[in-house]
Amino acid sequence: MDGQKSSNSISPRDLYEKLGTAQAPILIDVRKPADFAASDRCIVAAFHRAPDDIARWSKELPAGRPVVVHCVRGGQTSQTAAAALAAAGHDAAYLEGGITAWSEAGLPTRRKLAVATGKWVTRERPKIDRIACPWLISRFIDPNAQFIYVPDARVLAVAKETGAIPYDVKGVEYTHEGERCSFDTIVRIHDIHDPALDRLATIVRGADTSRHDLAEQCGGLFAISLGLSANFADDHAMLKHGMVMYDALYTWCRSLQAETHNWPATKPLPQAAV
């Protein structure tokens, strides 16, 4: 097998190209408890599970979605976990080189912060930041997060009642800071470094704070967001469609900025009737 790539492995770069969208695999950190505790970083969107308890937690994984597991260096721990998941019927692979190779490649990690109940609450009738933030949380922090929309006056009370994290309201941790919006604050607190996400953050900031000069895409995001809000009375229905929009915008920020689109030069224009 020298020089050959394992059929059940994935490179850091190939995994990165899948992240940030609904097509991303479930990403599970199977570092041994001591290794996990010794580090203050984790790969974005990954959640930790004990490698010696696979028989239990594998039953909780949704059917039909690919799974990628990683350990420190892509060695026996993650390879054994991937094999066990495959034997249980999952489409499983391990990350080549583990979180070490991922980090050395400059790919995005986040600060390892506990996220309370996994619930987040904000004001109803979202437009930009309150759709962009759930996308960011779901795609980069907690893929199992739940989002609650309530009247402005009820946000803090509902947060206290449910243990949900309040965001994009005055006086809380996850909110606007100066000229930066709540999306920026989440990126800062969780210490996520990703050039594509930085580009997207600029677009969101410009659209959310009426500074469309920050990036030429700001005005387009503003227009589409207001149009979505006008078309959906149900905030969660709007969020569902907004997730697709931000998946597409993030993909463009990451991989498609060099793409162009124009009328094919080789295609003759129709001739006007004489």
Where are each of the predicted segments found?
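Short, structured coil segments at secondary-structure junctions
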Residues: 42-44, 88, 143
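Short acidic-hydrophobic, aromatic-tinged amphipathic segments that line or gate anion-handling sites
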Residues: 49-50
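Gly/Ser/Thr-rich loops at beta-strand to alpha-helix junctions
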Residues: 73-77, 126-127, 154
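Catalytic cysteine-centered active loop of the rhodanese-like fold, especially the PTP/DSP P-loop
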Residues: 54-101
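Extended, well-folded catalytic/binding cores that form a central cleft or groove in large enzyme
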Residues: 117-125, 132-268
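Short loop/helix-cap segments at secondary-structure boundaries that form the rim of catalytic
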Residues: 37-44, 157-161
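Flexible, polar/low-complexity N-terminal or interdomain linker segments that lie immediately upstream
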Residues: 1-38, 110-133, 139, 262-268
